[in-house]
Design a protein with these regions (language model features):
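Metal- and O2-centered redox machinery and metal/ROS homeostasis
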Residues: 2-23, 44, 119, 123, ...
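Active-site loop segments of alpha/beta catalytic cores
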Residues: 123-347
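Intrinsic-disorder/low-complexity, polar/charged segments
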Residues: 55, 105-109, 287
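A gly/proline- and charged-residue-enriched helix-loop-helix capping module
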Residues: 97-135
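A broad, low-specificity signal for short, low-complexity segments enriched in glycine/proline
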Residues: 35-39, 103-106, 215-217, 235-239
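Short, basic, glycine/proline-bearing loop/turn elements
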Residues: 41-53, 108-120, 247
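N-terminal basic, low-complexity leaders that serve as flexible interaction/assembly modules and, when applicable
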Residues: 1-96, 222-223, 322-347
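N-terminal small/glycine-rich loop or linker at the start of catalytic domains
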Residues: 20-51, 81, 86-96, 104-107, ...
Length: 347
């Protein structure tokens, strides 16, 4: 078992319930299990990404690394948002340059016949097995996830996603619905296996205007949020620009990018929805003293908010030094909220 002491119930789940009234806020990091860690790179030298994503023992080991190395308050499952195309009967490869490749490419209505949905329990059984291993070992909450349907469609279709949406909306919406249905089944499998919360990454929603978001993304996200029985966090690189649209979906939490002050954004978010974020990931290139200073600015601005979860405004970048990531996490863990004893580390 990991050695970190854990509150019961964990502060991360308390914050998701908007009830983390005592002590510091919880902290975890998007992409915390990833390329900035030398331990991850050691595994990467031995295995192709396909094997890393689809081997339960490697899923377990990589998911657990940041718990042991940087001491975050929650684990997020090591997986890929393109598991859904696998469950649609497509092939996903990671050639190393230019990002993942989905084959065959789905570029229009005529290509929908290439999609052959499979039961997620069969196609993605390795995810379930990895979750089981983690739940036997870790003492912090485990976050499962999937990609937003629009984002998954973007990867499946390439650069022509909006062309398809406008030129043949009927078939485009059929694909979005198919992705949504498989995503719900996939997340339900994760919940049954033991994850404590879900985050939906609709990363490419920043390609959309507000009107387009309400048409092409929001209805499908709504279906997912309403279908899942554990707390759901929504994230997009455009979340600071889609505050009211995200709030309308009534998730348990919204994770915001760094383009707008979080203490201002929260004024537009009901007190029943937690807020997560939102340090600019590139600040972690700065010296640790600067990282501490910038992190403390956000902590002070959000001090006393029982629904605050500390995170970056996007995933940690692959060339950030581990000590800099640890400086961010340690700053949060050493933060003394109003009414606590100064200098006391609350783990």
């Amino acid at each position: 078992m990991i050695s970190s002491a854990v509150s019961s119930p964990p502060r991360f789940l308390n914050a998701l319930a908007c009830k983390n009234a005592a002590g510091r806020p919880p902290v975890w990091i998007m992409r915390q299990a990833g390329r900035y860690l030398p331990e991850y790179q050691a595994i990467r030298q031995k295995y192709p990404l396909e094997e890393m994503f689809r081997n339960p023992e490697l899923i377990f080991e990589i998911t657990k690394q940041p718990l042991d190395i940087i001491g975050v308050d929650a684990a997020i499952l090591f997986a890929d948002i393109l598991h859904i195309p696998l469950a649609l009967g497509l092939d996903v490869s990671f050639p190393g340059k230019g990002g993942p490749v989905v084959f065959p490419k789905i570029e229009g209505g005529d290509d929908l016949l290439k999609i052959q949905p499979k039961p997620v329990e069969e196609a993605l059984s390795f995810v379930k097995e990895g979750i089981h291993l983690l739940k036997e070992e870790i003492e912090v909450p485990l976050i499962g996830f999937c990609g937003g349907p629009f984002t998954v469609m973007t990867y499946m279709t390439g650069k022509n996603v909006k062309k398809w949406l406008y030129s043949d909306p009927e078939s485009a919406f059929a694909l979005l619905q198919t992705i949504t249905d498989q995503s719900i089944a996939y997340l339900k499998m994760q919940v049954e296996a033991g994850v404590d919360a879900i985050q939906i990454f609709d990363s490419w929603a920043n390609l959309l205007s507000r009107t387009e978001f309400c048409r092409f993304a929001q209805p499908f996200l709504k279906q997912i949020v309403e279908a899942i029985d554990v707390p759901v966090i929504l994230f997009s690189r455009a979340s600071s620009h889609f505050v009211s649209e995200f709030v309308a979906l009534r998730p348990d939490a919204i994770s915001f990018d760094w383009t707008y002050p979080l203490h201002e954004i929260r004024k537009r978010v009901p007190g029943t929805i937690a807020v997560q974020g939102n340090l600019d990931p590139e600040i972690l290139y700065a010296p640790p003293a600067v990282i501490q200073q910038e992190t403390e600015k956000i902590l002070r601005s959000m001090d006393g908010d029982p629904r605050y979860i500390v995170n970056l405004g996007h995933g940690v970048l692959p060339d950030i030094p581990v000590d800099h990531v640890r400086a961010f996490v340690d700053t949060v863990k050493n933060f003394s909220p109003r009414g606590t004893n100064l200098g006391v580390v609350q783990k």
